Design a protein with these regions (language model features):
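N-terminal, membrane-interfacial amphipathic/helix-forming hydrophobic leader that caps
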Residues: 1-70, 80, 211-220
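Hydrophobic, aromatic-rich alpha-helical transmembrane segments
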Residues: 5-13, 60-72, 106-110, 114, ...
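Generic detector of short, locally flexible boundary/turn motifs and exposed helical patches
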Residues: 6-11, 24, 86-89, 97-102, ...
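Alpha-helical transmembrane spans of integral membrane proteins, capturing the lipid-embedded, hydrophobic core
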Residues: 12, 16-24, 38-39, 71-83, ...
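Short secondary-structure boundary micro-motifs
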Residues: 30-32, 42-46, 106-108, 173, ...
Length: 220
């Protein structure tokens, strides 16, 4: 019995080590590039070679158009969170997330607004969802394979990393982004791991934010 279990244990251990190495490699590449282009390059190298993942992505691209109400609902929920959570965190003594870098870039500057929105819809939304949901959840599930609650634990850890990626906004920005990461992870799982619904929601949230900053509306 023990002889049969040993190869299984070693195989599981090997899978976990490989998953951790992939997570570390992707995070390192993203840090080096400091841009969504690096995120996409890393994810495509380490994830899209899997035939089943590519097929699932193509199927979900075809089907996402029927999910308009879901997009509206989750975009609304995230914006309610954006408006309320910083206020609650301020009561706990945390400063509000710092969005001054974006505000200074695009307020009243139509060319800058268009440039940022093009990035949002071509690389940022797709790249962050590929990393924050598709890749990290998949790899953490490989790390915790066979452990009860593996998916929930994977969502939490992936969302923590997603929050830390927004550390430039300060502690409250990390908490806000991490909480949004959990909501987007719930959407990803609820949509049977469709990335495209997430991409549209992510893009809509960022688009509204950029438009508000362009018109000088302070929302954080």
């Amino acid at each position: 019995m023990h002889a049969l279990q040993k190869p299984h244990f070693l195989n599981l251990l090997f899978q976990r080590i490989i998953a951790l190495l992939e997570i570390g490699l992707v995070c390192t590449i993203c840090k080096l590039f400091e841009a969504a282009d690096g995120t996409i390059a890393a994810i495509l190298l380490l994830f899209l070679h899997r035939r089943t993942a590519l097929i699932q992505m193509l199927k979900s691209l075809i089907l996402w158009q029927s999910r308009f109400r879901v997009v509206v609902l989750f975009t609304g929920v995230i914006w309610i969170l954006i408006l309320l959570l910083p206020q609650l965190l301020s009561f706990a003594g945390l400063s509000r997330p710092d969005d001054s870098s974006f505000a200074d870039q695009i307020q009243g500057d139509l060319a800058a607004l268009v440039s940022i929105l093009l990035k949002v819809w071509t690389t940022v939304a797709f790249g962050e969802e590929m990393l924050g949901r598709v890749f990290l959840i998949d790899r953490f599930e490989a790390v915790f394979k066979g452990i009860p609650g593996a998916t929930a634990l994977s969502v939490i850890l992936a969302s923590i990393l997603f929050g830390l990626a927004h550390a430039y906004q300060g502690p409250s920005g990390v908490i806000l982004a991490g909480t949004i990461g959990i909501i987007l992870s719930v959407l990803y799982l609820q949509q049977k791991r469709s990335i495209w619904t997430n991409v549209v929601v992510h893009g809509m949230v960022d688009t509204v934010a950029m438009l508000l900053l362009f018109f000088g509306v302070k929302f954080l």
